[in-house]
Structures are given as structure tokens and as C-alpha cells.
């Protein structure tokens, strides 16, 4: 097999993997519904480009109709190439809106030199994007955060915030007016890097926040990448943990009624027996099979009807 053919096969595998990962996330969290108008927030980075590209491909084949509109917030950063995004979006035929708001000057004026800008910048952006979604009549706001972003947020909150809290794949805004979705929730960052190279997206670097030294999120990201190299499967296992939460074996008295526990009461996921049910590899080092008596902890899902976004559009009569 020639090197060129082998590379083409790898590229096809990557595209299918990303499509299915995004489709699975959309299905699992019911992110997209018939008639939705989705505002895709486009920053000019690899993640948001990939998000828009994959959603466009799903839109073309999905069994439901939904609209996409790309929105970019021009924060008036010095040297920002204003022509890049309009040129790209017009070339692929996606409706778009460029919102011009000088948040850069606000952040620089309010914060002392050397302070990280992410928190304030994020709050300013969020308010502007919510307002824009309302003006455009959008029903959903799609952000480009991926699996690694979600895990990084989990560790940031544990290390610096004292909370067991990550970044949800789907949420309702504080004012209750907007639904925010993260269709890349199941996607690995390293796959997005490869996809950006494959698609040759016109990447725009963020000089406002990406270049800040000693950024806590960057440190956490480096830690996760190091773990991924040295301990294959660890990142996947950690993300799986976010989908398999056992409140009775944590220590949050608001999440679980420890005070009301009584003898003879059975717990949904077991009492002390749950400590014996740590998931082991499929085969032990001696080659023996895993103990079938292991207690399986499965997430509980609400009963609901969800349209499979990965299914094909129904063919017209006579087609």
C-alpha cells in the first residue's frame, strides 16, 4: 500500500471518528431538535472550525432539519485579521454575523498588568453572545469545548475551587433564556489538531489569552497530555467517571441523605460492597477472565424519544 493511499485511509478514519463522536454526544444529550436554529460560536481556533465543519456535514445528512449561523466576536485585539473569517465563511456558504465589541480595551483597562484575563474576558463574551443569540432568534448556542477542556475544568475546580464540577455538555443559561451545547464533548483534542491540519483551516491565534504565562488551564492541560502519553487509557477512564457518579460514595450531604441512613436500608449502588467493585482490566495479568460477580454501575437515563442525528435523511418517494 502506497504512503498516499495509507494517509487517505487514515484521514477517512479520522473524519468518521469525529462525526460519530459528535453525533453520539448530540444523541446522548438531545442537543439538536427539529427546527433548531443553532448559533455556532466561531473564534478562529481549530476547535470552533472543526465544530462548524462537522455540524455542516451532519446537517447535510441528518433525518431532521436545523439551521446553522456562525457568529464571531471581534474583540478589537491589535493585529486581528478581520478579513479571514468572512472570507472563509463566504467560501463555504454559511450564514454568519461578525459582532464588533471592544472587550480588549475593557479587559486591559480593568485588570492589572500580569493578571490573567480569561475570567473577565469570558464573562464579557458570554453576555455579548447571549444577546446576539436572542437578536438572531437562535434556539441553541454551540461552543467548541472538547473532552480535554471538560477534564481540565474538572481539575481546575478541584485544585483551585474546592468543587467537584466540570463543564456540562448541555446547560441552560443563568437567566433561563438560552440552551448552550458542546457537541465536541466526546472528542479528543489530539484528533482536532489532526483534523485542522487535514482541513487546512485558516487558524487565527488568540493573542489576548493564549500567550499568557503560567496560565492555570495551560498547566492542567500539560498534565493531562503527559498522563495520556505515559498512561494510555487514563484520560478515557477519567471522562467515563464523569458519566458514572455514585453520590452515596462521595461526601456531599446535599447530594445524598447521609443523615437519614438507617440499618436495613439498601443502597442503589451498594454500601461497603461497592468498594469491591473497582473495574479491572478485561483480563488480569495471569490471563484469567474478569470476575463476573463485579457490581456494574450504570448511569440512569431519563425515558425520552431522541432522533438519531447520525441516521440518514429519509429518501423522497420514488427516489
Curated annotation (Swiss-Prot):
Motif (PP-loop motif): 43-48
Binding site for [4Fe-4S] cluster: 118, 121, 209
Enzyme class label: transferase
UniProt-listed Enzyme Commission number(s): 2.8.1.-
Sorted UniProt keywords: 4Fe-4S, ATP-binding, Cytoplasm, Iron, Iron-sulfur, Magnesium, Metal-binding, Nucleotide-binding, RNA-binding, Transferase, tRNA processing, tRNA-binding
Subcellular location: Cytoplasm
One of the GO biological process terms: tRNA thio-modification
Pathway terms, separated by semicolons: tRNA modification
Superkingdom per UniProt: Bacteria
NCBIfam families per UniProt: PRK10696.1
PANTHER family: AMINOTRAN_5 DOMAIN-CONTAINING PROTEIN, SULFURTRANSFERASE-RELATED
Other comment: The thiolation reaction likely consists of two steps: a first activation step by ATP to form an adenylated intermediate of the target base of tRNA, and a second nucleophilic substitution step of the sulfur (S) atom supplied by the hydrosulfide attached to the Fe-S cluster.
Subunit text: Homodimer.
The protein's name in its UniProt record: tRNA-cytidine(32) 2-sulfurtransferase
Protein's organism: Neisseria meningitidis serogroup A / serotype 4A (strain DSM 15465 / Z2491)
High-level lineage: Bacteria, Pseudomonadati, Pseudomonadota, Betaproteobacteria, Neisseriales
Encoding gene (name): ttcA
